[in-house]
């Protein structure tokens, strides 16, 4: 709801994502929060306060680490990561993947060594029942003659609600 350099989706294109979250229209939102300093933290807090008990996964602008963009110091992204964890948002997303894979300013190393040292569990959808879906049985992937892919699986009945399976 805060204007971002004079623009926001609520006032310009009439999108009220916070209302959609509260009404249960969306289960998760990945807002593009490609800002730094005081242009970042109020937005993160606003999303937390108005999430409607749904997932908010802020998109962090790691492309700004590039000298060809705004040449942010790595510490800017690190502070944003700590802050989004401190206020208990539901993870982070990154734009653009190329800067992560190229390890721009050591972002990949930083994340791997200090933030994502173990596999992450998907946050619970507390507005749903507490039992996660079963792992599909007998998955199959076929290449069709027209070049399309056909994916199928059998419904599994082994769900006891207590196991975590890593694939």
Predicted regions and their residues:
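Flexible internal linker/loop segments at domain or repeat junctions
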Residues: 1-15, 22-23
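Short beta-strand/loop segments at the ligand-binding rim of alpha/beta enzyme cores
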Residues: 1-5, 53-58
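Amphipathic helical hotspot of TIR/SEFIR-family domains
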Residues: 42-45
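Pro/Thr/Ser/Gly-rich low-complexity, intrinsically disordered linker/stalk tracts
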Residues: 106-162
